[in-house]
């Protein structure tokens, strides 16, 4: 056991001597580790190996204040310096019977979410159509009217929240939540809300815009239906194209069987004549 320890110490000494020939950048704002036990011969080498620095260069970087604390001459400070200063401040305040600094205050998550929604609303561009144009829709109580009208329809309520806030978080009662935007909702929900707007605020301008949107929607829906019919026709054609192969094989089998039966009859006739 002692032999292996001596071997390890010898290897460390050789490594330390080898590393000592290299130049290392002076230490930063952290404090390097120091191994006690200077009475032993190898302790200086271990300290030098761990510190990775020249003591002369280190002394040129640091200076001591009146309290004996080490500080960098270039004025840079780190976490260690902050903790030392904080500890000294706490001791001084307690000696003077002053209250301790306030602890870290926990802010509820809902506050952050509401702040985020507020920032999103401020950054949004007023590019919405119908009665949602401008920033006075909340003042007019439009969303309150629509939310009351669709109070039993959860999807439309989520759509209205997304329309007002830019997005809505769903599934808050489960572990996995999902953020939905206005474009994530079905077209049928959007049209239902727009129809209700036309009924509640029957203005000519809104009706004209709604009719234009309905024309575009109906045109796109007709194109989609036509493409779906073409796809169905192509699928049927493909199925019918595959059927003739099966029918042709079965017809060939029937033809061969009939040919075999015909030959068997001819063979029977020949055998009868030979008898």
UniProtKB/Swiss-Prot annotation:
GO CC terms, sorted: cytoplasm; DASH complex; spindle microtubule
Pfam families noted in UniProt: DASH_Spc34
InterPro entries with a match to the protein in the record: Spc34 (IPR013966)
Broad class of the protein's primary localization: nucleus
Transmembrane residue ranges: none
Keywords, sorted A to Z: Cell cycle, Cell division, Centromere, Chromosome, Chromosome partition, Coiled coil, Cytoplasm, Cytoskeleton, Kinetochore, Microtubule, Mitosis, Nucleus
Disulphide-bridged cysteine pairs: none
Gene Ontology biological process terms, A to Z: attachment of spindle microtubules to kinetochore; cell division; mitotic sister chromatid biorientation; protein transport along microtubule to mitotic spindle pole body
Superkingdom as given in the UniProt entry: Eukaryota
Subunit structure: Component of the DASH complex consisting of ASK1, DAD1, DAD2, DAD3, DAD4, DAM1, DUO1, HSK3, SPC19 and SPC34, with a stoichiometry of one copy of each subunit per complex. Multiple DASH complexes oligomerize to form a ring that encircles spindle microtubules and organizes the rod-like NDC80 complexes of the outer kinetochore. DASH complex oligomerization strengthens microtubule attachments. On cytoplasmic microtubules, DASH complexes appear to form patches instead of rings.
Family note: Belongs to the DASH complex SPC34 family.
The protein, known as: DASH complex subunit SPC34
Species: Kluyveromyces lactis (strain ATCC 8585 / CBS 2359 / DSM 70799 / NBRC 1267 / NRRL Y-1140 / WM37)
